[in-house]
């Protein structure tokens, strides 16, 4: 961060640290209120600062208050911090905040975001160097979807770059962006990435969710593809389970129940139970209530899953009926653990009021 000495009202140069602290305090004072003209002028001057931290603070105010009148200054600052970036903007603090402000101000110039998308910033760390521009590339990846002048083919061609980025967080943003583009081409691109089976679980999860969110006429085939990963190792299987749950689709629920009935270890059984209840479909709740009644070993997992999502008095009453039909002490103890009498929504809590 580079700083120039400020001049006080008396004309005497102020110490750098005092100048910085004063400017920072003035900016932070505007966080909770809409800035007046004097405040906007301060933000404008801060955007022109050489200090990347102050610029980041100013950019945050531009974004929070939607200060469209400062778009030109925000763009100029963004450009400036690509010059000698390791020295002028370590950790990409300024560029990260500035690009978020540009998105908030509805800047749709693709050239702005392409510059950020293709920027890497290797900074010295213990034992070598580390790229600090991953967040910037991820934000620019998402921003490109809303840009003007990019057709579907051109946009997907660009998004191939972040889909192969070394940073998994950027690859996740790329998958989400491709999902937002939609259409058959986007679906095929995501399907190819999934079928390679060479991705980290979190990125696979983003691909699953994006693929399942695309309306392209082959919903059953997509659900079947993702369901195939329920047997593909712990973390990848968990990502598949929760991606299926997000669809709230009866076919996705059927795939989850089918896999649950095949048996699983304690951890993955719990994952499946949580995914089933997260579909928020009545058939899923009915299945888990049946588990409580008929499977003493799996009942605690089903009880915990239901309790994490539903705590209403109505649901508690239904669960209590299934527990009573189970006629098992272990199941009863698990019910008391996950549905305590004092829990919000329980009959006892209503009586206490």
Identify the residue ranges that each predicted region occupies.
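Alpha-solenoid HEAT/Armadillo-like helical repeat scaffolds in large eukaryotic proteins
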Residues: 42-46, 73-86, 115-128, 158-166, ...
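Glycine/alanine-rich phosphate-binding loops at beta-alpha junctions
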Residues: 49
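Domain-scale selection of a single, long terminal region
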Residues: 310, 351-352
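Generic beta-strand or strand-like secondary-structure segments
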Residues: 73-80, 97-104, 112-115, 139
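Core helices of alpha-solenoid repeat scaffolds
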Residues: 36-40, 71, 110, 114, ...
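Structural detector for internal amphipathic alpha-helices that build alpha-solenoid repeat scaffolds
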Residues: 11-35, 53-68, 88-107, 126-150, ...
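N-terminal amphipathic/basic-hydrophobic helices that include classical n-h-c signal peptides
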Residues: 1-12, 346, 353
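Short stretches within intrinsically disordered, low-complexity N-terminal or propeptide regions
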Residues: 7-8, 242, 254, 284, ...
